[in-house]
């Protein structure tokens, strides 16, 4: 059993993600596509900010065992109050390498306690007030999604991709 509260309080060395093309791999046309969609939709890009933590190897091993998958990548995302991720699909420069393993599977775990204002949209499904530890399986690892924090506490999720 993972103590998610302990995990959240001990996270270090996160990578902040904002709408700053200088920090994106703009050689990958998919980044430009998402940025164009946001600009064309008059999206408030100042509201886009989250932090990814990649020091998740121990958790990855436990969760991958529970899900019976071989992990390729995992991370914890944190959205601070008042921010969101923007509607997007995840772009990974290592995707070609991952696909050599066959069909990819993706799962997300709600690791925060339920809190007013926390919302996760996956395709056409909306998730809110999910109990801590709830696991959802994605139908497509590249599904469009959006995390939103309209609450007063940080919103954390654990994500894992494997085969």
Outline where the language-model segments fall:
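A short beta-loop-beta micro-motif enriched in histidine and acidic residues
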Residues: 70-72, 86-107
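Tight coil/turn sites that cap or link beta-strands
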Residues: 80-83, 133
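Short catalytic/ligand-binding loop motif for oxyanion handling, primarily in non-cytosolic enzymes
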Residues: 83-87, 94-95, 118, 144-148
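Short, conserved beta-strand element in jelly-roll/cupin
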Residues: 78-80, 97-116, 161
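A general structural signal for short secondary-structure junctions and capping/turn motifs
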Residues: 65-68, 98-101, 127-129, 148-151
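Non-heme Fe(II)/2-oxoglutarate
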Residues: 1-75
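Catalytic core of Fe(II)/2-oxoglutarate
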Residues: 113-163
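Short, surface-exposed charged micro-motifs
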Residues: 75, 108, 146
């Amino acid at each position: 059993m993972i103590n998610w509260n302990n995990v959240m309080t001990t996270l270090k060395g996160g990578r902040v993600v904002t709408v700053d093309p200088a920090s994106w791999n703009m050689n990958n046309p998919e980044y430009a596509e998402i940025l164009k969609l946001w600009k064309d939709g008059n999206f408030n890009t100042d509201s886009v900010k989250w932090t990814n933590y990649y020091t998740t190897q121990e958790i990855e091993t436990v969760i991958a065992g529970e899900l019976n998958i071989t992990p390729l990548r995992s991370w914890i995302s944190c959205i601070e109050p008042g921010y969101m991720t923007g509607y997007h699909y995840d772009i990974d420069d290592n995707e070609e390498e991952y696909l050599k393993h066959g069909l990819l599977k993706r799962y997300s775990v709600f690791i925060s306690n339920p809190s007013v204002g926390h919302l996760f949209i996956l395709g056409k499904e909306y998730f809110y007030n999910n109990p801590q530890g709830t696991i959802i399986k994605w139908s497509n690892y590249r599904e469009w999604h959006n995390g939103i924090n309209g609450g007063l506490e940080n919103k954390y999720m654990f994500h894992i991709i494997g085969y």
